[in-house]
Amino acid sequence: MLNMISTFFDSSSNFSEAFLAKLPEAYAIFDPIVDVMPIIPVFFLLLAFVWQAAVSFR
């Protein structure tokens, strides 16, 4: 059981390093796009409210 818990914490530390990784140099031109990508779902949420306001929240 302790082995399983330690394996979980070891693997979770690897995931945090992956999220902070940089793109390879060949893809450096896509850095601005990659920076904006996590915000895109928020735009869809806001679009839903704008759409409902346009149809008077039926």
UniProtKB/Swiss-Prot annotation:
The keyword Transmembrane helix applies. It is a single-pass membrane protein. GO terms for cellular component: chloroplast thylakoid membrane; photosystem II reaction center. Its main location: plastid. Residues 1-21 form a propeptide. The keyword Manganese does not apply. The chain crosses the membrane at residues 29-49. Keywords: Chloroplast, Membrane, Photosynthesis, Photosystem II, Plastid, Reaction center, Thylakoid, Transmembrane, Transmembrane helix. It holds the Pfam family PsbK. GO terms for biological process: photosynthesis. It is found in: Plastid, Chloroplast thylakoid membrane. One of the components of the core complex of photosystem II (PSII). PSII is a light-driven water:plastoquinone oxidoreductase that uses light energy to abstract electrons from H(2)O, generating O(2) and a proton gradient subsequently used for ATP formation. It consists of a core antenna complex that captures photons, and an electron transfer chain that converts photonic excitation into a charge separation. HAMAP family: PSII_PsbK (MF_00441). PANTHER family: PHOTOSYSTEM II REACTION CENTER PROTEIN K, PTHR35325. Belongs to the PsbK family. PSII is composed of 1 copy each of membrane proteins PsbA, PsbB, PsbC, PsbD, PsbE, PsbF, PsbH, PsbI, PsbJ, PsbK, PsbL, PsbM, PsbT, PsbX, PsbY, PsbZ, Psb30/Ycf12, at least 3 peripheral proteins of the oxygen-evolving complex and a large number of cofactors. It forms dimeric complexes. This is Photosystem II reaction center protein K. It comes from Chaetosphaeridium globosum.
